Amino acid sequence: MSLYGVYDPDNVFARILRRDLPSHRVYEDDDVLAFLDAYPQAPGHTLIIPKHGQARNFLELDDRAITPLFSCAKRLMKVIVAELEPVGVQMLQCNGGDGGQSVFHFHIHLVPRWKGQPLGLHAQTPGDAAELAKLAERLRRRVETMSFEQEWWT
């Protein structure tokens, strides 16, 4: 699919938002939903999506959604680093089929990385549902207990 087209209200992420499909939710508020990727590239591979609008990609995203999405991404990256101790975290956002996008509902990937692990766009095999459920619970607990106080430079 190209950058331009009609939003499909039955895409997998829209169905997850409506709870028509199960997901391993890590975080949710009025504006965003974060859940573990069912086809993870690495343990803790998290997807963050807007709960409002019908943006297929970043070009279509309402400006008011940007701050909640990227604030959530920063918080969850801190959670992933604290809980899983990766040596890096890949933050990825693809636009259009030729840009690597496979689900046409705006989303951000957070992929923990460890030394020697190859970079990739999409995993080919689903994660183990029981392991995903355990990991989602660990990350939810960390979200609930972690401080996110921001210090600003002066």
Predicted regions and their residues:
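HIT superfamily nucleotide-processing domains
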Residues: 1-154
